[in-house]
């Protein structure tokens, strides 16, 4: 069984600057980490490999520093890794990102199963996985919280649809996005880290390596949406001080709670 897991390096801090001209996050040199939801995707792949055998390839898109998350996936148990990195890919929205990942997947060959985390912590759109499946022309199932059955032909999955649980059977090849409730992710193996050579091979693909080399379909040029600005939510916190003895303070507090209708 050939499994592909899409992973992403996301900012590890909220102190991230934004390019004033493009509205894009400036990621170079920023403290980063593996997207938490992708840990659940990796663990799902490892469990399926243990059950059905096969190989696991991890795929990421970003600057060269994104090789760090691919290395982390090696230490956890991935067999191969590939990074899509080109300045022409920069500033991509969900559509351009999905298209780039789909093109990269085609260059890597055929996969039985593609796994994505439900969403990323820097975008929270939960759209890349489904859009990637559409570009590849394969069925997809989202919000997976449990694999009820897995065999050589397909998967039986339970999905969390917020107000209900849904069960579906999907044949290979397919793409699934997994939620945080599916498994507890394993930690990177120190022994495996020692066993892996200092410079394990990570395949690097650029725009010229894609089957479709039309740069207008990638990055900012291929993005139908663009971010105007990113800003923290406004906080309207009012502070009021009262002075007096216990009876005065109790009366003041009672008045506020009554006014705010906290007491019914």
UniProtKB/Swiss-Prot annotation:
CDD domains: ETF_beta (cd01714). Its main location: cytoplasm. Its EC number is 1.1.1.436. GO terms for molecular function: electron transfer activity; oxidoreductase activity. One of its GO terms (cellular component) is cytoplasm. Part of the stable heterotrimeric lactate dehydrogenase-Etf complex, which is formed by the lactate dehydrogenase LctD and the electron-transferring flavoprotein (Etf) alpha (LctC) and beta (LctB) subunits. This is Lactate dehydrogenase (NAD(+),ferredoxin) subunit LctB. The gene is lctB.
